[in-house]
Amino acid sequence: MKKNNPIALLPIGVFLVLYLGLGILFEYVMKIPMGFYNIPIIIAFLVAILVACLQNRSVSFDKKLELMASGLADKNIITMILIFLVAGAFVGVVGRSSAESVAFFMLALIPARFAVAVLFVVACFVSTAMGTSVGTITLLTPIALAVSAASGFDAPLCIGAIMGGAMFGDNLSFISDTTIAACNGQGCAMKDKFRENFKIALPAAIATLALILVLSFRSDLNGAVNESYNLIQIIPYVLVLIGGIMGINVFVVLLIGIVSGSFIMLATGQTAPTDLLANMGSGSAGMFETAMVAILVAAMCALIREYGGFGALLHAIHRVFKGRRGGQLGMGLLVGAMDIATANNTVAIVMANPIAKEMASEYGITPRKTASLLDIFSCVSQGVIPYGAQMLVALSAAAELGYEISALNIMTNLFYPGFLLVSVLIFIFLTPHREKR
């Protein structure tokens, strides 16, 4: 990493002004419907990368291209892109009718008022088992939208419920990339981090579920939704959900869904053999923008890191926060800032690990608590950025199924990260220091 240089963070500011600033201006000041869609996120990132390339003229353009390429050479980035594409193929194969059958079947078994609460709980379990919030959101978004259409609940509320549940599970799962990154970086056992994490995350999940139930009971929905459904078309989603709960690798789960979905759609005559591959292709194509965002973010962050932008951020946080509680809050803001900058909580944790470990040693904070705080605050940050992988994959899946939903609509219905922030702040400032080193 080069000498600390706060100016290197300018591309992030440029992106935020273009995407968030103009989006808010168009939608809420100029009252343009779906104003955020007038700001293509890829163009905003391209402008930000252009600004990054114009900085630091002591580095040649060819060298900058090499740096951006090195930023893409990361397992997490490749895994994320492949999940996007394979998940898109799954959505393309099973189509909207299969998701609707799942939703109608669920709503036939439970009162319509509890539909959103059930979505949240299911997402919690699936994400904990699968270890990926992105995979969980991809699998459950079509179901959430079908539940919305069948029950009358707003689509952003249903998507917000599954996103919150997915973040809860990803935050706790033993096989989550964020858990692995945090525990390896801080040198603690996963079971110890889980126990520390669970007592913070559980109250937030309970509060989220309670709020969803309150909103549900305030609605005028009564009884059950009685719509026809095809049990055979439910099979791909059942297999995928069972695979997720069993903790099977997300790629294996999605491939099972694609194979079973293809067979069922062909056998029932829902899809012609000549259309099957085309449907897969259109489904994956619906994820192209999401995959491109992941690529552009990785490239931009590689330049910022080389210029010393992240080093300056780390140094500033380390210098400002003093004392044990201040150290814990500083760790949280550190990884939160990294997450906002990179839009990838695993990358943010990896980047924050070295300075967080140093702060933990200085302030007497145990490795398990440090790992837990890094994972929790990165989760909170993912809930407040409209360009995170979780949000993008939800929007892409919704768009693929014909729904026009803005990130801000979902963010106002994404309750879990807010409750998690309150829970962790209470834990930091009101919990007495009793742990042993």
Predicted ranges, named:
Residues 7-21, 35-57, 78-86, 117, ...:
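Hydrophobic mid-bilayer segments of alpha-helices in multi-pass membrane transport proteins
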Residues 38-46, 50-55, 64-98, 113, ...:
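Core transmembrane alpha-helical segments of multi-pass membrane transporters/permeases
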Residues 74-80, 104-122, 148-158, 202, ...:
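Membrane-interfacial loop-to-helix junctions in multi-pass transporters
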Residues 80-91, 111-143, 318-358, 362-363, ...:
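Hydrophobic alpha-helical transmembrane segments of multi-pass integral membrane proteins
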